[in-house]
């Protein structure tokens, strides 16, 4: 399939594709003295990606490659800028500049044919368990492979290339991603499996969550704490004194992340978090985004019914505006913990029947971190 990003508005291209295009353009300029305004790339599925180039110029500190047959000095360094385009996908990297410096050198023994390094704005891995080794730049394997496959034919047999990636806004943007939690510091990651960003698929985001499990296992944690997000993380650390690496934030994607847990051999999970998200699991809802399914009031009404005979109170629960409002009703009836203990028990029953081989426990908290209910595996 051909993706022409001069015309394409729905799909976008990844940070990895930006680097490939920038590297190709820079080397082509050095070899042929021609400034390309588009680059045609190929991904691992043999799709064609046509990516626009923002700018290309000789490197600021162009060293001397050689004196060619015409007697002219030939520079060996170029800088290319490619603007990231995310199509219709919601992506914080949309529109940022990816700067790629290329340097051509004579092939040397024990030197790689193509060397790929990071610069300012590209994160550095500081924890074990990820696809990239600790201490290296967070440039994932697939983009590395795509870079090499697309530029190898531009190089002479006696020639090697150094590709350096800089992202001017990378360090600032990284604070809005999972990178700090994963131990990737100083910038964003260079990502992309196919090089194409697909709109609103959530696939890229879900895949970015999964490495948290790898980090936890690499640190030899046996019991992992799965939580929807910041509230759960905050209070898990306070209540249990655990490190960030022991906590896995699943966002809304419980089914995906529990599948990954089984795949990676996790044996013990504590489901911990705010009632508004966790109670959905008791209803068999494993994508907890409100646009997918809600049913919080219906679930709370159902699990309150064994303890309440008054139909009007049950109706008040059903038509409450927030979970917090329902909590107040249950407190007034002196059945708060009974209801949430029952919900926690049902959460454990449901996930245990679907994801066999994992010991589950569940703790449900309110916005202040107080425990509403729990069911601990024994």
From Swiss-Prot:
GO terms for biological process: anaerobic cobalamin biosynthetic process; methylation. It catalyses: Co-precorrin-5B + S-adenosyl-L-methionine = Co-precorrin-6A + S-adenosyl-L-homocysteine. One of its GO terms (molecular function) is cobalt-precorrin-5B C1-methyltransferase activity. The keyword Transferase applies. The keyword Metal-binding does not apply. It is an enzyme of class 2 (transferase). Keywords: Cobalamin biosynthesis, Methyltransferase, S-adenosyl-L-methionine, Transferase. Pfam families: CbiD. Its EC number is 2.1.1.195. Pathway: Cofactor biosynthesis; adenosylcobalamin biosynthesis; cob(II)yrinate a,c-diamide from sirohydrochlorin (anaerobic route): step 6/10. InterPro entries: CbiD, CbiD_sf. Belongs to the CbiD family. This is Cobalt-precorrin-5B C(1)-methyltransferase. It comes from Methanococcus aeolicus (strain ATCC BAA-1280 / DSM 17508 / OCM 812 / Nankai-3). The lineage of its organism: Archaea, Methanobacteriati, Methanobacteriota, Methanomada group, Methanococci.
């Amino acid at each position: 399939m051909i993706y022409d990003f001069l015309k394409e508005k729905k799909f976008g291209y990844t940070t990895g594709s930006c680097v490939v295009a920038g590297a190709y353009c820079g080397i082509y300029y050095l070899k042929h003295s021609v400034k390309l305004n588009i680059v045609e790339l190929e991904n691992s599925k043999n799709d064609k990606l046509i990516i626009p180039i923002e700018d290309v110029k000789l490197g600021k500190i162009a060293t001397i490659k050689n004196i060619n047959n015409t007697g002219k000095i030939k520079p060996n360094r170029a800088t290319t800028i490619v603007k990231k385009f995310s199509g219709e996908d919601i992506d914080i990297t949309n529109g940022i500049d990816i700067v790629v410096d290329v340097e051509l050198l004579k092939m040397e023994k024990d030197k790689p044919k193509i060397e790929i390094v990071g610069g300012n704005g590209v994160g550095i891995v500081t924890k074990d368990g990820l696809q990239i080794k600790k201490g290296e730049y967070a440039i994932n394997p697939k983009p590395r492979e795509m870079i090499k496959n697309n530029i190898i034919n531009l190089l002479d047999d006696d020639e090697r290339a150094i590709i350096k990636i800089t992202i001017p806004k990378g360090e600032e943007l990284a604070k809005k991603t999972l990178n700090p939690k994963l131990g990737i510091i100083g910038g964003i990651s260079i990502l992309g499996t196919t090089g194409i960003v697909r709109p609103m698929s959530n696939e890229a985001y879900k895949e970015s969550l999964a490495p948290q499990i790898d980090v936890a296992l690499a640190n030899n944690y046996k019991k992992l704490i799965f939580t929807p997000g910041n509230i759960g993380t905050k209070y898990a650390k306070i209540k249990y004194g655990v490190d960030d690496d022991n906590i896995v934030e699943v966002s809304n994607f419980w089914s995906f992340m529990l599948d990954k847990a089984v795949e990676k051999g996790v044996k013990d999970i504590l489901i911990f978090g705010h009632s508004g998200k966790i109670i959905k699991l008791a209803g068999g809802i494993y994508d907890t985004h409100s646009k997918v399914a809600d049913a919080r009031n219906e679930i709370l009404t159902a699990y309150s019914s064994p303890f309440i005979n008054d139909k009007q109170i049950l109706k008040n629960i059903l038509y409450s505006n927030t979970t917090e409002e329902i909590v107040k009703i249950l407190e007034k009836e002196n059945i708060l913990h009974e209801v949430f203990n029952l919900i926690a028990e049902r959460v454990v029953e449901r996930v245990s029947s679907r994801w066999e081989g994992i010991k589950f426990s569940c703790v449900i908290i309110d916005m202040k971190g107080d425990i509403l209910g729990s069911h601990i595996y024994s």
